């Protein structure tokens, strides 16, 4: 099938150029522009303490705007379900509810023989499927040096897997896949997996502060890899944290997206780039509190970006008068929290939580069996705890609770709905009708004329299209605008696909919207574990504040402008036929533009609720709009559209 598609696209190529990564390059220009603007702002902030504080507060406010809202705090309903003895410390097995029905499992490493409240820290787990696992070497080291550690299972890890069978066994190959699949539904509801991790971690810290053996004034947070991500997202919004360390995550988003592309779903909050929030900004919000960066020279997390980001941290802390409160260790290793990094971590936390710079006491390397360390009876909260809600159930409940709010919003009229829709699509308004039509080819066939064009709109990707004008066309002939996710060439390569249309005198217009057909991103740039053929471009688009669906809506409007302007097409009714990923973009375009007379869709998502109920689906991010389900679902647009929209399957 792949060979057929490639040859078909070559034969039916309309663009006068060929560059397989053109679409990603186009998107990355916005990433670079946003980063450059942010660089200008931070350099100005470095000129004075007041300017620095103003910059940090601005970052914090913009972060709050995009992270979404959090629920009211309710009873944690803490259960201490067991205790395991270690060498110089003990481990309590803990379960609490961060919100009703959401159970969080954790291990609390407590130093032995302490007579006064001890300092404590959260350890936020990396992406290992076992989460907190049977043990944590870093937590053992901390506890052996008089610092309590609460190691928290994130959503989708440890005893908190969501995509499981009836026995509690995982249905995906790892935590990064589960995180990515769950995040799509969260995004539609106006939140993210990162924000939900933040909430669970915030409630974990709330729990620590209920304990009389913990000193509430001496609290820290650290994490490695995915735990480093959680730490970065956490420390800027919780002033209770007095010291922190980020391991094997810290770099710059610009470098990461350019070198390896977007990471999994828990490592992105939509619109970060649009709001000019770089990874170092989340760390900078910790200032002037002590912060440690831990990196490896051979980590896949880019070291050059880490060094550039750390230089900004140094400048910030220097301007604020506390240069000693930020540090970075780079070791001759790769990814993760290895022994040398753990030693530095413990030393840093001892210094700032205990005012103690004596050598770090070596910890015994105790080994525990995973089965002995489980907090739940069956190894997973969702099959063990009465009343437990899966993330899917939580999100469906939220969606149903908002039903009346959506109806109230939709009743405000088309002008209000359209304004919000454009905002969600990342459009500042409907584009004007100024396009440039460039003819790129013409072939005469026995039954029709074939014309090739690229349609150019300032600031947008060109739209390649092929116009089939049958010899039987007349003034009343409809235009069939066909959008095929497999590419226009695949459709046109089989004469049988359009023979009947020629006989009936229908005008055919086939186009590749950006990211499909002629501008398809090479498959090797997207890891299959993300379950999305255009994951990198979809995530970059969300990062810069231009969801990929919104860009494709613009492409459809460009095609409608072409139909309104070209001498062969003026005055002919436009009927749109779309399949697959194109479906939701066409639904939005039909609501926005009355030049579409009818729509027929096949093999496409019919309601976003499908993504929330059954997140094990391909290509969700191609059709995610951040927070859209607060306002409408796809069936609402179909119901309110001025033209008939139907699904043919």
Kindly label every feature range from the protein language model.
Residues 6-103, 287, 291-464, 468-480, ...:
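Alpha/beta-hydrolase-fold serine-hydrolase catalytic core, especially in secreted/extracellular enzymes
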Residues 109-111, 152, 222-224, 229-232, ...:
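Generic beta-strand/beta-sheet core signal
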Residues 115-210, 251-262, 268, 474-566, ...:
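Cap/lid segment of the alpha/beta-hydrolase catalytic domain
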Residues 129-137, 172-174, 188-196, 221-232, ...:
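Alpha-helix capping and helix-loop boundary segments enriched in small/acidic/polar residues
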Residues 145, 203-275, 559-631, 635-639:
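Primarily recognizes the serine-hydrolase "nucleophile elbow" in alpha/beta-hydrolase
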Residues 222-225, 231-235, 240, 246-254, ...:
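Catalytic-domain carbohydrate-binding cleft regions of carbohydrate-active enzymes
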């Amino acid at each position: 099938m792949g060979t057929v598609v490639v040859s078909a696209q070559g034969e039916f190529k309309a663009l006068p150029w060929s560059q397989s990564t053109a679409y990603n390059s186009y998107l990355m220009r916005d990433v670079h522009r946003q980063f450059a603007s942010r660089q200008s702002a931070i350099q100005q902030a470095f000129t004075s303490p007041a300017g620095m504080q103003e910059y940090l507060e601005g970052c914090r406010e913009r972060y709050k705007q995009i992270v979404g809202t959090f629920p009211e705090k309710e009873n944690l309903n803490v259960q201490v379900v067991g205790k395991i003895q270690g060498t110089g410390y003990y481990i309590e097995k803990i379960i609490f509810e961060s919100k009703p029905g959401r159970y969080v499992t954790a291990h609390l490493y407590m130093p032995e023989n302490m007579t006064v409240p001890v300092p404590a820290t959260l350890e936020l787990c990396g992406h290992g499927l076992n989460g907190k696992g049977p043990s944590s070497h870093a937590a053992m080291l901390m506890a052996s040096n008089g610092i309590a550690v609460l190691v928290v299972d994130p959503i989708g890890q440890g005893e908190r897997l969501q995509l499981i069978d009836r026995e509690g066994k995982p249905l995906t190959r790892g935590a990064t896949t589960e995180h990515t699949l769950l995040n799509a539904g969260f995004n539609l509801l106006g939140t993210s997996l990162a924000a939900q991790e933040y909430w669970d971690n915030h409630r974990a810290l709330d729990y620590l502060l209920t304990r009389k053996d913990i000193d509430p004034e001496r609290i820290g947070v650290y994490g490695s890899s995915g735990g480093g991500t959680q730490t970065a997202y956490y420390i800027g919004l919780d002033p209770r944290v007095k010291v922190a360390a980020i391991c094997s995550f810290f770099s710059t988003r610009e470098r990461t997206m350019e070198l390896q592309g977007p990471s999994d779903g828990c490592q992105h909050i939509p619109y970060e780039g649009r709001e000019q929030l770089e990874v170092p900004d989340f760390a900078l919000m910790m200032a002037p509190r002590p912060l440690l960066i831990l990196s490896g020279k051979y980590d896949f997390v880019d070291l050059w970006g880490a060094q550039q980001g750390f230089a900004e941290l140094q400048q910030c802390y220097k301007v604020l008068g506390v240069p000693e409160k930020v540090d970075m260790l780079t070791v001759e290793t790769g990814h993760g929290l290895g022994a040398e990094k753990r030693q530095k971590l413990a030393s840093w936390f001892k210094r700032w939580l205990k005012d103690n710079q004596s050598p770090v006491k070596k910890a015994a390397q105790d080994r525990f069996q995973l089965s002995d360390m489980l907090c739940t009876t069956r190894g997973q909260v969702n099959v063990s705890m009465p009343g437990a809600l899966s993330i899917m159930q939580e999100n469906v409940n939220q969606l149903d609770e908002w039903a009346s709010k959506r109806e109230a919003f939709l009743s405000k009229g088309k002008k209000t709905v359209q304004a919000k829709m454009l905002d969600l699509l990342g459009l500042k308004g409907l584009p004007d009708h100024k396009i440039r039509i460039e003819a790129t080819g013409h072939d005469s066939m026995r039954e029709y004329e074939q014309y090739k064009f690229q349609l150019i709109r300032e600031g947008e990707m060109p739209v390649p299209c092929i116009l089939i004008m049958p010899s039987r066309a007349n003034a009343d002939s409809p235009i069939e605008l066909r959008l095929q996710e497999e590419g226009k060439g695949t459709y046109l390569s089989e004469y049988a696909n359009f023979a009947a249309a020629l006989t009936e005198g229908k005008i055919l217009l086939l186009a590749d919207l950006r990211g499909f057909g002629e501008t398809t991103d090479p498959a090797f740039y997207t890891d299959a574990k993300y379950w999305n053929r255009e994951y990198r471009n979809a995530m970059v688009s969300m990062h810069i504040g231009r969801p990929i669906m919104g860009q494709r809506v613009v492409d459809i409007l460009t095609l409608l402008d072409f139909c309104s302007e070209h001498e062969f097409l003026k005055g002919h009714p436009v009927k749109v036929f779309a399949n697959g990923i194109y479906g939701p973009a066409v639904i939005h375009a039909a609501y926005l533009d009355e030049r579409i007379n009818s729509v027929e869709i096949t093999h496409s998502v019919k309601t976003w609720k499908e993504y929330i109920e059954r997140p094990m689906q391909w290509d969700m991010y191609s059709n995610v709009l951040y927070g859209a389900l607060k306002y409408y679902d796809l069936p609402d647009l179909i119901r309110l559209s001025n033209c008939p929209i139907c699904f043919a399957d």
